[in-house]
Amino acid sequence: MNSVFTIIFVLCALQVAASFRQSFGPSMSEESASMQLLRELQHNMMESAHRPMPRARRVPAPGETRACGRKLISLVMAVCGDLCNPQEGKDIATECCGNQCSDDYIRSACCP
C-alpha cells in the first residue's frame, strides 16, 4: 500500500514540476525567437567585419598624416636638423600625434 502512495506522490510531483517549468520558464517559441535574433546579429556582425574598407579610409590623403613616436623624431630631424629643444612649453608630441602639424609649427616649437 505504501508503494502505491509513493508512486502516486512521485507522479504528482513530476506533474507539478513540469507545469511549473511551463508556467515560469521560457516557452519554446520565445527561445527560438531569441536564438533567431542572436543568429541574425552574429551574421550582421560577421558581414561588416569582413567588408573591405574603401581605399579613401585606409590610406590618408596628403596632409592628413600624423606623426607619432619615431615618425615624429624623423620629422623633427628632417625639419630642424637636430633633436627637439622645446620652446614656450609647447608639447609637440601631443599636437603632432593628435592633429597634423606643419613644418612651420615644428620650427617654432623645436628648432633653435
Curated annotation (Swiss-Prot):
A GO term, aspect molecular function: hormone activity
Signal peptide: 1-19
Source organism phylogeny: Eukaryota, Metazoa, Ecdysozoa, Nematoda, Chromadorea
Top-rank lineage group of the source organism: Eukaryota
Record's protein name: Probable insulin-like peptide beta-type 5
TM helices/strands, residue ranges: none
Subcellular location: Secreted
Gene Ontology annotations of biological process type: cellular response to salt; chemosensory behavior; dauer larval development; insulin receptor signaling pathway; negative regulation of dauer entry; olfactory learning; regulation of synaptic assembly at neuromuscular junction
Keywords, ordered alphabetically: Cleavage on pair of basic residues, Disulfide bond, Hormone, Secreted, Signal
